[in-house]
UniProtKB/Swiss-Prot annotation:
It comes from Caenorhabditis elegans. Residues 20-73, 80-133 form the TIL domain. The gene is swm-1. Its main location: secreted. This is Serine protease inhibitor swm-1. Keywords: Cytoplasmic vesicle, Differentiation, Disulfide bond, Glycoprotein, Protease inhibitor, Repeat, Secreted, Serine protease inhibitor, Signal, Spermatogenesis.
Length: 135
């Protein structure tokens, strides 16, 4: 009898319907590169986490785990990668190793984005110290 109760509990937990939070939807295969406040991970593993809640289209996940519109991202709810800083209005012409001082640039505001911190430049997916750029 005890084993039957345990098996019933295991089956109930395994087949339970997951409830998603506001602005989320249940997906059969979760994308581990889910867009977040400030950035979308570009280097991530390809794996499928089944029956998980993803942010609905048009929403991103903040550092508190909530799905919000990009306009709702703030410095406090955004966790930027190493050597990056949150900008409410970032540049469309971020400095890179190849172009450390971009001169020709359209005036665009990239809203609520993580970009390289002062003294760092973009090199591939990361921000590195200017002096560490390949020669």
């Amino acid at each position: 009898m005890r084993i039957l109760v345990i098996i019933t509990c295991i089956v109930a937990v395994a087949t339970a319907t997951k409830t998603c939070e506001a602005n989320e939807e249940l997906v059969s295969c979760h994308n581990t590169c889910e867009p977040q406040c400030g950035y979308t991970p570009k280097a991530c593993t390809e794996q499928c986490i089944m029956n998980t809640c993803d942010c609905k289209d048009g929403f991103v996940r903040n550092s508190l785990g909530k799905c919000v519109e990009v306009s709702e991202c703030t410095k406090e709810t955004t966790k930027c990668p190493e050597n990056e800083t949150f900008f409410g209005c970032g540049t469309a012409c971020e400095a890179t190793c190849e172009k450390p001082n971009p001169t020709v640039c359209t005036k665009q505001c990239i809203v609520n984005v993580c970009q390289c911190s002062k003294g760092f430049v973009r090199h591939g997916l990361r921000c590195i110290d200017k002096k560490d750029c390949p020669k």
